[in-house]
């Protein structure tokens, strides 16, 4: 087992990784920018190293600084968390070249799945169902029009190197297509340095359902069920739950085994998530995330499997200790992403937390690096923490979530807690009758007023 792990991240995920390391008896190294000197993961780690000024490009994305921190501390492995360098294949290669283990997938799989066009082609070859669309990047507007007419409008123009909703535009008619192509290309170039785009059939009211996988790189891989991430705003997930209200056990087992078989074929290593749109009883592959997900605790709550701990084990060369037949699903779990933002305008609200009281009780988990007196810096993602609740049934889980949300106190900054308090009292959410466009319609209709 590794002796010392450097955690190349910040916030709640840095603390989450630190806890897994402690439970394995592994020494921890926290890295931080000057803005994060008082962060909780820095306080709790065995060692800490300042890697640069507040800007992420000068600190958390600064590969030479991270390598220096590994050398100074003698860390023999790096866990990248999510975001930042977690899906950077070159970073994984550089670490390996310097004798440091990367706790994550093989670089070739990170690179493959980071290219959305190649990822879709590979998924299709592996037997994973995909959304009808172009076979590769669009070469001209004329080609795009021909493909769009073939698959039928509306269509979605997507950046090949995209993610997080950037470089995505809908064209409802042939007349809309040139503008959608031009806008998506411009956004893709600005965000990813690559203006390649491709076309997919636009699904009007799908759910966003993802399958959690875990592989050991030796040909063993399992699935850990699904998460329903359909409550989204601007393609950003807000609330996740498992199991999905839309799936039954046979549908879950079928798509899960398709995905797990595909991961066995490529000898996938570490945790990963295969994401689908789901409509009219059919799954359509959209992408694969080759990292731990923000919403991984939902899966941990219903399977009692520590995903971060398993990431560390298999990165050290261990075979999976869990067979598919050993995976059991218990009850229901829901996660709310609590952001330091205005709940209506979603403007970030950095500042000092004056009062902080996270909820507790049976079946309640809070993954957060916040504490009373903590000053939320303005330089990074506004995620304050995650409230995860488990119950024997979905109904019990929702009642427990209502109670936990009402108990949660954060003063000094604005948060999205009021949004979640409204959502868990809405009939559609209570019935599980929502899709990926539902939340934006709810907000537009004044579902939550400032």
Language-model segment annotations:
Residues 159:
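N-terminal nucleotide-binding beta1-loop-alpha1 segment
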Residues 59, 80-84, 108-112, 133-136, ...:
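Glycine- and other small-residue-rich loops at beta-strand/loop junctions that grip anionic moieties
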Residues 147-156:
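Acidic/histidine-enriched active-site and ligand-binding environments that engage anionic O-linkages
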Residues 122-131, 153-154:
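A polyampholytic, Gly/Pro-enriched intrinsically disordered region
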Residues 1-126, 138-146, 179, 396:
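ATP-binding N-terminal substructure of ATP-dependent carboxylate-amine bond-forming enzymes
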Residues 29, 79, 101-103, 131, ...:
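Structural detector of well-ordered beta-strand residues that form the stable sheet scaffold
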Residues 34, 54, 108, 136-139, ...:
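Short, solvent-exposed coil/turn elements at secondary-structure transition points
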Residues 7-26, 48, 71-73, 89, ...:
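ATP-dependent carboxylate activation and anion-phosphoryl transfer catalytic cores
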